């Protein structure tokens, strides 16, 4: 593992015919980096959006996280990503607030991001 990285799963999100519609991943463990970066990431190809595929994938990842004895997860979004914020609300995540990224955070350094909306999910 690279420095400060954690074990993770990555999956394609596919329909019943095997067509790839997007991707999702689950990061295992707890750290300051995961508070800001989140345990779950997802992306859905534009033509498949609006069908709750991200939410369905998250529900499956919640079950996988339980198998790793995780008691809660964070999903973080860019504050202006209304679609992802709606997914977190749809999944009944607890909105913890909008947090400023630390100066030494990779997302701040590499991606020029400054803030994250953070949602907590008790499993």
Describe each PLM feature range.
Residues 1-35:
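Acetyl-CoA-dependent GNAT
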Residues 8-12, 23, 41, 74, ...:
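Short hydrophobic/aromatic beta-strand element in the GNAT-like acyltransferase core
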Residues 23, 35-46:
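Conserved acetyl-CoA binding element of GNAT-fold acetyltransferases
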Residues 42-44, 50-67, 86-90:
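Conserved acetyl-CoA-binding loop-helix of GNAT-fold acetyltransferases
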Residues 65-76:
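Conserved GNAT acetyl-CoA-binding A-motif
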Residues 76, 94-111:
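Conserved catalytic-core motifs of GNAT/GCN5-like acyltransferases
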Residues 80-97:
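Conserved active-site alpha-helix within GNAT-family acetyltransferase domains
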Residues 114-122:
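Ser/Thr-rich low-complexity repeats and stalk/linker segments
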